[in-house]
């Protein structure tokens, strides 16, 4: 299993390849706000662990294993953002909140959150009911 840091790199590499068709060390460094030398070290580790194939000065490609995990990590991130919107978290806080929790949840918890998102999306009245509960709770605390 990849570490949380490895997951961040795999997720970002997956997104860059999906968006641009390739991922360079400089692109990864910029996206993650880290030094290129840190990216090179992590890419070498990901290569060793068979998440990607890296050739110095030639670039990198995700292996089947890396693509599968990258896809799952992007799904997890997107699902958690969706969940945060449903429960009414301020849009400006969602990204950082998701970044703060995504590595600490089991895949079982992610699957259950997926069930909950689906439950709310099946009927808009459910979301409105939740909003009513939230408004009532806000009034109590004021």
UniProtKB/Swiss-Prot annotation:
Q: Which GO terms describe its molecular function?
A: DNA binding; DNA-binding transcription factor activity; manganese ion binding; protein dimerization activity
Q: What SUPFAM superfamilies does this protein's entry cite? A: Iron-dependent repressor protein, dimerization domain (SSF47979), Winged helix' DNA-binding domain (SSF46785)
| Keyword check for Flavoprotein | no
Q: Fetch the SMART domains from UniProt.
A: HTH_DTXR
Cellular compartment(s): Cytoplasm
Binding locations of Mn(2+) 2: 11, 77, 99, 102
Does Transcription appear among the keywords? Answer: yes
**Per its UniProt entry, which superkingdom is the organism in?**
Bacteria
What family classification does the UniProt entry report for this protein? Answer: Belongs to the DtxR/MntR family.
Q: Subunit structure, briefly?
A: Homodimer.
What name does UniProt use for this protein? HTH-type transcriptional regulator MntR
Organism the protein comes from: Bacillus cereus (strain G9842)
């Amino acid at each position: 299993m990849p570490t949380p840091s490895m997951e961040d790199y795999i997720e970002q590499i997956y997104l860059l390849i999906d968006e641009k068709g390739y991922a360079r060390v400089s692109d990864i460094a910029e996206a993650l706000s880290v030094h290129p030398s840190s990216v090179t070290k992590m890419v070498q580790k990901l290569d060793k662990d068979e998440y990607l194939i890296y050739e110095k000065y030639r670039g990198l490609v995700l292996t089947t294993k890396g693509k599968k995990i990258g896809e799952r990590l992007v799904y997890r991130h997107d699902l958690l953002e969706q969940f945060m919107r449903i429960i009414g978290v301020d849009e400006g806080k969602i990204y950082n909140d998701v970044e703060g929790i995504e590595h600490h949840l089991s895949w079982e918890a992610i699957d259950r959150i997926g069930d909950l998102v689906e439950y709310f999306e099946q009927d808009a009245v459910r979301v409105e009911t939740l909003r009513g509960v939230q408004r009532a709770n806000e009034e109590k605390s004021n």
